Amino acid sequence: MHDQLEQAIQDGSGRRGRTGRVARSGLLSRVWRPEGSGVLKPHRSLDAQRVAQLECALWVAYYRGEWIRFLRAAVVVIRHVFGLSWLSTVRASWFLLRATQLWAPYPDNDAAGARRAMERFYRLLKQQSGEPFDPAEAARLEVEWWHLHRIHQHSNADSDERALVDALAALYAYAFRVPDTAVRMAAEQRALAMRYCDQWVSAGCDLQSSLIAQKRAALARSYASLAAAVQPA
């Protein structure tokens, strides 16, 4: 089943035409739009609460090892945020799933494999959007903050989060071509969401835990701050 799905996704990589392009209406026009230089930026009307709810569900599935649920959540998140065609959404979701599965084992994970999968993810976004970023660099920055979060996750709970925040800000700054300082608050709130998530994992991943609401709220603040930071003056 794994090989069949992988082949189907690869078969779709060469398709072009209307179904292979980023939608310029619907969800994309409400959430993401080109600004000035053409960089995809969060729309002013981005629903930070909705995106946070979707990503929080993704985190819950990841830490509970519920990979089918993770894939379903990834499809909803990617479709909602990027407005890709359904084919491209499924392909991007598969690349994200494979990256996280390769990253998940501790301590013996496959960081290089995770980077390759994320490079495929970002290459797909670049193909669909036409944006001038380097998929390999975006993947490197992405997996770097995964690495720093894992170090923090398995160290003292009160250890310094500045390196993690710096890595998140670096990814945002690269993706949206803004100064690190402009997106630092968004990075700080995302790091806070991870702190709540780590506490939730340590406590046993209880679906009734109030920590889920706390990390969802921090993610919402992060997305709201990010959307505000990358808008033109």
What are these regions (language model features)?
Residues 71, 78-82, 122-129:
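A conserved position within tetratricopeptide repeats
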Residues 45, 206-233:
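A cross-kingdom marker for long, charged
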Residues 76-100:
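Short, charge-rich amphipathic alpha-helical segments embedded
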